[in-house]
Amino acid sequence: MRLIQTLSSCLCTGIIALFTACSQAPQSPIDSVDPFIGTGFHGHTYPGATAPYGAVQLSPDTRKGNWDACSGYHYSDSTLMGFSHTHLSGTGCIDLGDILFRPSLQTPLAFSHSDEKASPGYYSVNLKEAGVLAELTTTPHVGIHRYTYKKGIEATLVVDMDHLLDNEYMYEGWVKRTGDNELTGMRRTRGWVDNQYVFFVAQFSQPFSSMEQPSERQAVLTFDTTTGKPIVCKVGVSIVNEENARLNLEQETDSYGFDFDAIHQATRSDWEKELDVITVEGGTEAERTNFYTALYHSKIIPNIASDVNGQYRRHDMSVATIPAGRRQFSTFSTWDTFRAWHPMMTLLDTTLVNDMVQSLLDMYDASGELPLWPLSAGETGTMIGYHSTSIIADAYLKGIRGYDAEHALEAMKISAEKNKKGADYYIKEGFIPTNIKKESVSCLLEFAYDDWCIAQMAKALGHMDDYETFIKRSQNFINVFDGSTRFFRGKRQDGNWEAPFDPFAIGRSYTEATAWQYRFFTPHDVYGLTQLFGGREAFIADLDSLFMVTSEVVGDLVDVTGLVGQYAHGNEPSHHMAYLYSYVGQPWKTQEWTRRLLDEMYQPTPEGIIGNEDCGQMSAWYILSSLGFYSVCPGSNQFILTTPLFDKANMKLGNGKTLVITANQPDKNKYITKVTLNGEEISHCYITYDQLMQGGTLDFTLSATPDKRWGTAPEYAPYSYTEQPTVSIPYIANDLDLFEGEITAELKSTTPEAVIHYTLDGSEPDENAPVYSEPFVLKETMIIKAKGYKKGFVPSRTYSIQATKAVLRPALSIQPTKHGVAYTYYEGEFQWVADLQKAKVVETGTIPEPSILNAKLPDHFGYIFTGYIYAPEDGVYEFSTRSDDGSVLYIGKEKVVDNDASHAAIDATGRIPLQKGYHPFALHYFEDYEGEYLGWSWRTPSMSKLDAIPTENLYIN
């Protein structure tokens, strides 16, 4: 359209412009990168300078103390506090922001985005009001600043070790002058991870004119700029000690002196090499920008944790030295990156993969457990699963083996046994009781996949006993599948489902998700999952529904973004789901949905990443999907095929070979009709790692309409552990917990024509047990077990549930007359309500009902409310709390509602039989950080739904 308009207005000029455009070479990968992508919305990336996998991330800080401050920068801001040397990319938690430099006494400093520039290894901003141009570049361990002050402006530079992006605790810190043009400093903090050390040595291109210290952790420097020369500062950083910070500075920058441009060019050359690993042709300019920016974001993490002399700080705080040629890494968001980022790196950089596995094993050696989310020299403990096992197994099974495999298997097994997030119940009971542990369903599903990974590693090493143990555990997902709803659901310790159940609700049984977003997470056994649904047709119908139902969710969770139906591309549990159609004979739907997600979820704008970028995972999804394959099940060595986005792509593989990917007019055609590798046709809807690593040409023949023949036969489906038709586990739809009088139980199975055998005495049913034929009545507490059978099918797992007859809790023989509740108010940092008992009491008093509106702090406080609640009738009562963060409700000494731990606003419920009368209660609550909320409600025996507890039913004695 622009060309037509130009020709209409000036034909001659248009022809010249057209000729010039046609003769220009395509833009290089590095010039297609836009570091501002992801700095808006909730992408949480930063625009500043860093080297590939650099230990230093030198970037502006525009905000702190809230969720969108995770990277220190948000595009919606128009002022900045300065430039600090460490940052996280795309995370959902805040930390770092170490060693702030601010080239002015003014704070904050106003700026305009029109005065910013950013490219790999470089950032600049013209701070016009302050009269200074700030430019930043880095080497792996050194941040380099260049400040050009406007004539007549006093050249002042503030160095601030008090600056924090979050409310961290400062153990110690200082800044010292160690020369006419040199500062040194350090600090040790407790933030997202404890005992974070950072040391620096800063050298300046000219001596200070003066230095003042408002505190021991701050310095104000002035310089003589009458010569008109800019001030260049080089800041060497280490988490080990000052000597290493100096050594990093000397070895990486001494040869350049204070030549900012030369250092920048060297780092730019490093980035050109890193980004040249994949080049693409075709596509739109926006798509190429998205692609190369994704590639850039995938190479700024993890971060090098070892210094130039090989020393690094271990998770036990000791200092060790790695062998020559190796690097120690940290900043692993394993819950996110095991899915696509790590499998992608097995294709691109096997040396990096070996170094990462060695790093994970070193963390195990120092702490006794493989990490979940390591940062700096410690473990944050954030997120669920034990996905280091997936990363290690995937590497080993692909032949990347530069480490002690037996030691790795030992680490995997021990970590699976030690994991604190319900693994003890998972191992003993086969499920995690939702009334005891939050995130129980998500934890179980991810434990099951990780156990499959351990089983594959054990099998490859010939440890068949371990294989049998862990492969059996990998099937535990069956135990939380509810056939009546065809969802994975929270199960209480007695085997009854958590109620009420709303698959659209953000509940305590799931991690950053609704039930929809964990409905299809069995990457190691998709065929087994289809059997639970009752077969292919039911599975496909429900998978279709995922993308078609309403995108509304009940509750508030900022991580659930990028919704198409209940598919949430902005958070990782959904990332594999579009590829599941290829497992059930409809690969054309995989091709259709992946193209739509590529088009809609990524844009070349600051808001262009639809959720947290998450340390490269969102980018890796884009890269792999646009190349035409994706790893649904790391450890299987299979990549599911889909339609490429570009006409041609060249991948430099980690073994030195090159893979060329071609596709005919993917801008017009999004369906696969044929795939060949080096001329040989691939009939399966997947390709293996070994095939890809052969290199050569992977060619896709595409069409504009779906080809419903290619890849649809069952034998062409990808790997699943279950190979035989299997009866779905039986279920009872109604709740048998705390029934009054008698209750009817009805057994069912989603498998058509399944025969159910059952027992009522807790014994294991077999084909000799009674056959279920009709609903039966229960009048006493008992354990029901059931198992499904069908000719030609593998029998189901055993279903177990306890039916419990209600026994009323006696009321107290008291007659309180004063309405209200007593409260005790605490302040401090809490992770569990039990932490309140260790905190100092700040205030006590009475109020009409539990409320946190009078808290004296916005964050880090807690309450314990006590009193008596009047139950107006005999029967079973349901209580609920909705809280942000944790809450627990006791009636007498019985824990009725467990909504504990640090989390966003979610609901939890519990039931208890009460005699009419007065019962003591205690409601414990704490607020960690950000949002805060507390509400409670009940449903009496005569009520049909939950409602607020009336103040007239609350008493103090």
For each feature predicted by the language model, list its residue ranges.
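Accessory carbohydrate-recognition regions in carbohydrate-active enzymes
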Residues: 25-390, 396-445, 453-479, 485-488, ...
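Extracellular Ig-like/FN3 beta-sandwich strand-entry sites
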Residues: 230, 695, 742, 779-783, ...
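Short, compositionally stereotyped local motifs that mark structural "simplifiers"
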Residues: 719-824, 830-834, 840-864, 890-892, ...
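Aromatic-lined ligand-binding clefts that engage carbohydrates, nucleic acids, or primary amines
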Residues: 747-749, 869-871, 875-889, 921
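Beta-strand signatures of extracellular beta-sandwich domains
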Residues: 674-676, 755-759, 880, 888-890, ...
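Short beta-strand-plus-loop segments that form exposed binding edges in beta-rich domains
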Residues: 922-931
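C-terminal motif of bacterial Sec signal peptides marking the signal peptidase cleavage site
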Residues: 20-21
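Short proline/glycine-enriched turn/loop motifs at strand-loop junctions of beta-rich domains
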Residues: 151-153, 667-670, 749-755, 882-886
